[in-house]
Amino acid sequence: MKINIIKSLSFLLFFTFLVACSTKKDTFFFFFSHALSTKYNILYNGGVGLDNGVKAIKANSHDDFWQLLPVEKMQIIEDLTSTSKPKSTDFELAEAKATKAIQKHSMNIGGREKNSQIDEAYLMLGKARYYDQRFVPALDAFNYILYKYPNSSKIYEAKIWREKTNMRLGNDALVIKNISKLLEDREVKKQVFADANALLGASFLNLEEKDSAVAKIKN
């Protein structure tokens, strides 16, 4: 029994050592091992933190039916700066895990990212910063996905989150421009289409263009 335990621990330590030392090796085994470690260890734990933080925000939000309901339940604290430290330990955990995934498991070989989970890490990084109301750093993370991973399966989600962040920064005209361009793409899925129109409606309302807002909300 003890021999089997020792063998298992030895194999696990050896595998961990290989993963830790392999970010520049251009082989399928190393791509697979880094992607696996990123997804099922680091990003999983970060995702749990992110989900818990979002649940806490929703639990602490109360609808005022005498006021226009926002697209997203999140109370904005006006005196925060873009460099403020995270307020939530859940979002701090998510940001730390995303950063760890990027720093330890990114496999940029020949100018191309070989770890298929790194775009997910940047998306989590941006979301954690967004919910912590550090919108400028969040925008940096979303823009990085659009610049570095144009063929990512998460590209539409990243575009939606970029515009959510732009709206929080008061860039409503830019949101309308970018979302209108996004909606020209006939390949967008129903949820992306719905999120995009909700953002358009909110941005038009922020600019006090009520007729345009109503038209988009009806979509």
Language-model-detected regions and their locations in the chain:
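Acidic, polar-rich low-complexity tracts and alpha-helical solenoid repeat scaffolds
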Residues: 3-6, 21-219
